[in-house]
Amino acid sequence: VVQAGETVNDGTLTNHDNQIVFGTANGMTISTGLELGPDSEENTGGQWIQNGGIAGNTTVTTNGRQVVLEGGTASDTVIRDGGGQSLNGLAVNTTLNNRGEQWVHEGGVATGTIINRDGYQSVKSGGLATGTIINTGAEGGPDSDNSYTGQKVQGTAESTTINKNGRQIILFSGLARDTLIYAGGDQSVHGRALNTTLNGGYQYVHRDGLALNTVINEGGWQVVKAGGAAGNTTINQNGELRVHAGGEATAVTQNTGGALVTSTAATVIGTNRLGNFTVENGKADGVVLESGGRLDVLESHSAQNTLVDDGGTLAVSAGGKATSVTITSGGALIADSGATVEGTNASGKFSIDGTSGQASGLLLENGGSFTVNAGGQAGNTTVGHRGTLTLAAGGSLSGRTQLSKGASMVLNGDVVSTGDIVNAGEIRFDNQTTPNAALSRAVAKSNSPVTFHKLTTTNLTGQGGTINMRVRLDGSNASDQLVINGGQATGKTWLAFTNVGNSNLGVATTGQGIRVVDAQNGATTEEGAFALSRPLQAGAFNYTLNRDSDEDWYLRSENAYRAEVPLYTSMLTQAMDYDRILAGSRSHQTGV
């Protein structure tokens, strides 16, 4: 027992020893008191700081426990390797290392605690933690389940700093205020979080959780999940607010460059640079999408007066409707021919009629995509960098279809274009039953089910673009096909073939070869209109691309053996010669 007015320096507690401190104890090392489990009242032993008692520079290690009772004070304690500190009094500047734990009970106050890797602070109902620095708890990734590292709050946590890999979990009865979260740190809100600042950090508001007055700065994001609520959130440049279906965010301030990611199944109300906006009851009005922002308009839901600016995306599901849409340079639209969308883009007016499946004037870029379903049609479509136009069997094109460098057009069936295709990007024949090919070797998985398709167009202008086609070189001599119907093929188009047959079984072609470009109804093809983008080989054969007098283009083996074949055929002879040399040498050595 350290009596009031008495000071004890240094010492070690082990094997259920007790130290009762009414005076002052400095530099103690405690290795007992937790033998029966963490924070259990059945434990005996350890250091007990009584009312008026003071402990400084204590080290609490494996199985050690320091108990700070009401009116007691502990300062500069280091807790590590499974040791623990139980507070009903005051603890100042505690450091938790490697499974060190601090339990702040009702009436207890922890100030300036630092929680390092695998440390854990539990702030129980009626407890208070202020100025905590959290460096652990999120090593498993954002919002992952690390239950017993970091900080868990059932009471109150104030002025907390959460650094990279740090996590604060606010339970149903918990309250956290004035929290600062840096990149790589996160806060999981099941109770209440007030005045949180996200400087690259993350805040997750779960069902029944409430976050008020959150400020989202660059690199930070607030995620409001189903049943969660946020109020007075401010989104600054390059910050992001995500509101899931069934989540609610009200009084939102979206500043220029801030991103909103949500759907018409959520509730989001606030202001942006255009004025007031709303997303509620399946309707959106006045939403601004930029810097990674996205609005999903779901089936039977609608949106109006949407601005899709640089880095923003508007996605409209089949049966959804979006009117008065403005898409600026850098914005993206995702839809199919079952959606209804109308507005303006950088090329002018555009529209999609979900009833007829007709689309006109689309500009697809920056991750934007449009799918033409069976019976639908896309007219005068421009596909820019990172844009994708997909056509199902029975979908069609009209007018001018322009593919820029970095653009893609995917064909999942036979497709007809009654106009012109200008290709500086990639056209790819595909179907959902065909696995992705190993294009670097121009070989797909053998014996895969394949349905070959045709792309028919009046005119094709190649601007250095590529058409990826599938072919079988193991006997069936079948392939996808480009048909020029009554027009012409000009410029330069690269043909890239993927062998979807047995790559080890190449067969010599017969007749003119495998027709891959078919000029019909008086169509013409320039002599240099097509070329192979890479060597095409199967079995012992190389295959070449040839233009005939009928303007069609064919793949032919022409008995052009691969360079390896002469080597293979000479190996047996070389082996026999080598055997003779060895035999002669052996005879000479033995004198036989």
Segments the model singles out, each with a brief description of its role:
Residues 558-592:
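Outer membrane beta-barrel translocator domains of Type V secretion systems
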Residues 35-42, 139-150, 437-444:
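Intrinsically disordered, low-complexity Ser/Thr- and acidic-rich flexible linkers and loops
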Residues 139, 147, 273-275, 279, ...:
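Acidic, glycine/serine/threonine-rich low-complexity segments
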Residues 33, 52, 82, 107, ...:
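Generic structural motif
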Residues 2, 8-13, 19-21, 25-30, ...:
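Fold-core signature of tandem repeat domains
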Residues 15, 34, 63, 82-83, ...:
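Short, solvent-exposed coil/turn segments at beta-strand boundaries
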Residues 10, 131, 196, 269-272, ...:
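Extracellular beta-solenoid/beta-roll
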